[in-house]
Amino acid sequence: MSVDLQTVKRVARLARIAVSEEDAERMTGELNAILGFVEQLNEVDVSGVEPMTSVTPMEMKKRQDVVTDGNKAADIVANAPATEENFFLVPKVVE
C-alpha cells in the first residue's frame, strides 16, 4: 500500500489539521516509509513464537481470597456525628 498526495490531504482534512502543499508532499514520503517498515514486519515469520504481553517476564502475585470485614469499622465511623456499635445513627425520616 502506498500513500499519495490526495490521501495525505484527505487524512489531514478528516483530522482537521491544516497542512501546506509542501508539508503534504513531505508527509507523503514519510508515511510511505512508515508503511514500508510495517510491510517488512508483516514478512517476518513468527510461527511458533508465543505471544507476549510484556517484554520482561512478569508474574502476577496472588493472595488468598479470604472474606474479611476489613477491621476498619472504627475508622469508618470515627467522623460520624452519631454512632452505635459501629453503625451510623440517622434521624428517622419515615413515620
Swiss-Prot record:
Keyword set for this entry? ATP-binding, Ligase, Nucleotide-binding, Protein biosynthesis
Q: Which SUPFAM superfamilies match?
A: Glu-tRNAGln amidotransferase C subunit
Q: Name one GO biological process term.
A: translation
Function recorded in the entry: Allows the formation of correctly charged Asn-tRNA(Asn) or Gln-tRNA(Gln) through the transamidation of misacylated Asp-tRNA(Asn) or Glu-tRNA(Gln) in organisms which lack either or both of asparaginyl-tRNA or glutaminyl-tRNA synthetases. The reaction takes place in the presence of glutamine and ATP through an activated phospho-Asp-tRNA(Asn) or phospho-Glu-tRNA(Gln).
Q: Which family does it belong to?
A: Belongs to the GatC family.
Give the multimer and partner information.
Answer: Heterotrimer of A, B and C subunits.
Query: What name appears for this protein in its UniProt entry?
Result: Glutamyl-tRNA(Gln) amidotransferase subunit C
| Species, as recorded | Mesorhizobium japonicum (strain LMG 29417 / CECT 9101 / MAFF 303099)
Name of the encoding gene? gatC
